[in-house]
Amino acid sequence: HTIIDGGLQDGSGFVHNELEIQTYFPVTANLHGLIKWIGKGIHMFSTPVPKSRYEWFGGTASLRGYREQEFSAPQFQVASLEMGYKTKSSVQTKLFLDIGSDHLNILATNWLGYGIGLSQVNENSIIRVEYALSNHSISKGKLHIKWISRL
């Protein structure tokens, strides 16, 4: 999805954008991959971006291996790569790697999160449990739990 808006704040024009792209691809009957990119940001044309307009990121939705909303910046991007294996039952396992940055060049300054996940999918809900580590604190892993209702 893509969202772009703009306007005036305190006499300065701004543009705010949000972009999310993902592609899912089967490798074999039981093995699949996912590539995802999220970018959000705001740019003020004649004044600095106020901290109240910063974007928050980190955690299960954007950069696993870190606390929920651990980082804030005028803009950020996170790229994710996942490889998943689906058993014959409703259980799926996956390995993942997230790389995030608050700079345009994601390779220059970044945070890494990586780990393993387990999901159970049924007709009523999806339960995901992911254990993630970061490149800044290998000894402090994060457990991310997500429950999604499928009503």
Language-model features and meaning:
Residues I38, I42-F45, V49-K51, I99, ...:
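Outer-membrane beta-barrel domain signature
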Residues T23-F25, M83-Y85, L118-N122, L133, ...:
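Residue-level signature of outer-membrane beta-barrel architecture
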